[in-house]
Regions:
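Intrinsically disordered, low-complexity sequence elements enriched in Ser/Thr/Gly/Pro
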Residues: 1-2, 208
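Auxiliary tRNA-acceptor-end handling modules of aminoacyl-tRNA synthetases
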Residues: 20-321, 327, 336-337, 354-391
């Protein structure tokens, strides 16, 4: 009896060893850009669009022109990832969304608080849910499949693959006001140049390349004929490519917790000259925007140093003169700041990459960048220092 029992046990063990549970789980091949919807970091984010590389001959293209910063909230809709500007007059209000970061739905006419969050943009994409493929007996085969059940509510889908090249921008920004698309037509579809999607750690960055052609009616406004020997030579500049960088970064990655804002009277601004941020506040009694508030723009004075990166082209051999001059200038500035003493609230400027390129894009909100434009531009762009500010 015992021998027979042992034999049966051995056969059972052998069969168990050949089952699906011991096989490696075979996952569906995923797009590299795919993210889990639950991983979208909760809270508010900063958003800034920036024009990237542009041809030097394009009169209406301003390379590395920073758009206006936006303080936003994010949630998923059926169309994709929606970016909405927060309601500054009610800073404690938040977009309604469920545990998986899908936007809430207003069930009643009176429940309309969500419309107070201005539309900024939508990143379209595809949603998916996955499950284990089952055999005829309903057992898992250790092979994953996409859940194609038509009755599955989109809010039950667990993953999102963005299509940033189909970006839908709703807001007006500085790029629109400065004529980035005025007098030109876009040709074809944008091309995704680079991307860094890590929503769990508060990062959604990407860069698009777009192709434009000057409208025939505006050709004299957007081609500098004075620099051309003939009409044929001038017409070559009638079409071009430009790049646009979009940076979405969670506030925890860039804002200093506990920072105290400084009110900055207009009289002081006229005498001293710091950059400022102005806004109008809603009076809760009169329901009118009758309060002007001006804040001083500054770095957090309590940090040890203000870190800057140099753009990659500083380290090209032809630009060594600019590199040396920049480093020497920063040293002189720090010497002047040190005169005020260590307790003066004036951190020194630190160049992080003094000897080699760091691959940091000037449009990435996580970094301060000194960007070298090392060739003459037909639009006459001069040096300027745009900054993003906490609202």
């Amino acid at each position: 009896m015992f021998k027979k029992l042992t034999l049966v046990s051995a056969i059972t063990a052998a069969l168990a060893g050949c089952g699906a549970d011991d096989q490696a789980y075979d996952y569906v091949e995923r797009d590299a850009k795919e993210v889990a919807v639950k991983d979208l970091k909760d809270g508010r984010w900063f958003y800034v669009p920036t024009t990237g590389a542009a041809p030097r001959f394009a009169l209406n293209q301003f390379p590395f022109l920073q758009g206006s910063p936006r303080y936003v909230e994010l949630c998923f809709t059926k169309e994709g990832l929606e970016v909405r500007s927060y309601d500054k007059n009610y800073p404690d209000a938040h977009l309604s969304k469920d545990a998986n970061n899908y936007c809430g739905e207003e069930k009643f006419v009176a429940d309309d608080d969500g419309v107070n969050f201005a539309q900024v943009l939508t990143i379209p994409g595809d949603f998916a849910a996955y499950r284990c493929q089952e055999d005829a007996h309903g057992d898992c085969t250790n092979k994953e499949e996409t859940n194609e059940d038509a009755s599955l509510n989109y809010k039950k889908k667990t993953h999102f693959t963005p299509r940033p090249e189909d970006l839908e921008i709703a807001e007006f920004n500085m790029e629109d006001l400065y004529g980035i698309t005025e007098g030109i037509d876009e040709i074809g579809a944008p091309r995704l140049i680079s991307w860094d999607f890590d929503p769990k750690n508060g990062l959604l960055n990407f860069e698009l390349e777009r192709t434009f052609r000057i409208d025939l009616d505006n050709i004299s406004d957007y081609i500098n004929f004075a620099t051309k020997a003939s009409l044929d030579e001038a017409l070559v500049d009638g079409a071009f490519k430009s790049r646009f960088y979009y940076s979405l970064v969670h506030e925890s990655e860039v804002a200093t917790e506990g920072y105290q804002p400084i009110l900055y009277p207009v009289g002081d601004e006229n005498d001293i000259g710091f950059f400022t941020t102005s806004t109008k506040k809603l009076n809760p009694v009169t329901n009118k925007y009758d309060r002007d508030v001006v804040y001083l723009n500054r770095f957090n004075p309590d940090q040890g140093s203000i870190k800057y990166y140099l753009s990659d082209n500083f380290f090209e051999e032809k630009n060594k003169l600019f590199l040396d001059a920049t480093l020497q200038s920063i040293d002189k500035m720090n010497q002047a700041l040190n005169v005020f003493g260590a307790d003066a609230g004036k951190p020194e400027i630190e160049i992080v990459n003094k000897t080699k390129a760091a691959g940091i894009h000037p449009g990435d909100l996580r970094y301060n960048v000194i960007n070298l434009i090392d060739e003459p531009l037909a639009n006459g762009l001069l040096g300027y220092g745009p900054s993003g500010f906490y609202p």
